[in-house]
A protein has these predicted regions:
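Detector for outer-membrane/organellar transmembrane beta-barrel domains
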Residues: 197-233
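Short glycine/serine/proline-enriched coil/turn segments at secondary-structure junctions
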Residues: 82, 189-191, 220-222
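Outer membrane beta-barrel
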Residues: 26-46, 58-185, 193, 202-206
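Cleavable N-terminal export/targeting peptides
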Residues: 1-28
């Protein structure tokens, strides 16, 4: 009796496994979950290190991120039919030399965390994500196009008034070689939050790209800062 029960259990397990495999194969054409990441550690030797009174010291160290910050993330895409799909992204950045999050003890665990919809009408995303002025600069005229997210030198962040923003709604659409995007982020009356209104236009064709962007940033204190960027490559 025990043998028969064992055989029945095995058969049921095999059927469940087969049906699970069939479901996975059927769903791969309409949805995907992708785990991605990069780990970057660099050795740095610096001379003339130290205060002005004694700057002849040398320093040897490991740094978490030479070309790019170490990071891992999850991308999700789900086909909703009618040419529309749902999107999800979560991304964490960390120092590979120590394993600690780059955001520190008080910063956000995920540097990106957003959901969205994409279809023939464009792409709409909501959450913590890249500032679209940063999108424009890094995709159009980055200082180092082979690695625009380079960890050592990032003038693009200054151009864009920061790489990311919280509580953001972002819309992007393309018509031929022209891409346009709009962004609005809520301050939510937070003492540390800020409100942004941003837009850009970008043209790219035949190996050439040019873009114009504008951002209005309002601090929690009420002070406002404006940024314009224009460039091409």
């Amino acid at each position: 009796m025990k043998k028969v029960a064992a055989k029945k259990f095995f058969a049921l397990g095999a059927i469940a496994l087969a049906s699970g495999s069939a479901f996975a194969q059927a769903s791969t054409s309409t949805s995907s979950v992708q785990l991605y990441g990069i780990v970057d550690v660099a050795y740095r030797h610096t001379n003339n290190e130290g205060p002005a009174a004694n700057n002849s010291q040398t320093l040897n160290q490991l740094v978490g991120g030479g070309m790019s910050q170490s990071r891992w993330g999850i991308n999700v895409s789900e086909d909703l039919g009618g040419g529309t799909k749902a999107l999800v992204n979560m991304e964490n950045r960390f120092g590979a030399d120590t394993g600690t999050p780059n955001s520190g003890a008080t910063g956000p665990y995920f540097q990106q965390s957003w959901v969205g919809l994409q279809g023939g009408y464009g792409r709409l995303t909501m959450g913590r994500q890249y500032n679209i002025l940063f999108d424009l600069v890094t995709s159009t005229y980055a200082s180092y196009p082979y690695s625009p997210y380079m960890d050592v030198y990032k003038p693009e962040i200054g151009f864009a008034l920061g790489a990311r923003a919280d509580n953001m709604i972002k819309y992007m659409a393309e018509v031929g070689p022209v891409r346009g995007a709009l962004q609005y982020s809520f301050d939510e009356k937070s003492p540390t939050g800020g409100k942004t209104v941003v837009g850009y236009l970008r043209y790219a064709a035949n190996g050439l790209a040019a873009g114009l962007g504008y951002q209005n940033y309002e601090f929690a204190s009420g002070k406002k800062l404006e940024a314009w960027t224009l460039g091409g490559s």
